[in-house]
Amino acid sequence: MSRYVINVTQYDDMQDLLCAADILITDFSSVSTEFAVQRKPCFLYAPDYDSYDRGLYLTPDQMPFMFAETEGKLLCNIRTFDESKYTVAVDKYWNFLGIKEKGTACQAVFNEMNKMLWHHTQE
């Protein structure tokens, strides 16, 4: 295995791994959407796509991730990855899904709580 690839199969907390990873290669798991919150590169690899019988909520062309059914196509997708196009595609994906997260939720909650507390002390 490459020194750039670490086998983390036995690691318990996937969320820690998503934060630590530089890129993600997955199939049609919902982990792709969770990972995309960080705007880090995510690639779909599904060599069994034609026989995928569980059904999908979205098709690969509805997602912002480059899709491959072969290792060769996956490597090509990684080599030709364009971060600016990916960022635009992820923003469109969030809009399509109705996600409004901008990375400022904690600040917005703090501001609202501060206004409520300030208003309460003025009464």
Task: Mark where each language-model region is.
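Catalytic binding pocket for nucleotide-activated donors in carbohydrate/polymer assembly enzymes
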Residues: 1, 30-98
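C-terminal alpha-helical cap of glycosyltransferases
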Residues: 102-123
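Donor nucleotide-activated moiety binding/catalytic core segment of transferases
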Residues: 1-33
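Pocket-edge positions in alpha/beta enzyme catalytic cores
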Residues: 6-9, 66, 98-101
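Residue-level signal for the nucleotide or nucleotide-sugar donor/cofactor binding architecture
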Residues: 12, 69, 104
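An acidic, carboxylate-rich microenvironment
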Residues: 16, 72-73, 108
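Residues within well-ordered alpha-helical secondary structure of globular protein domains
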Residues: 20-23, 80, 115
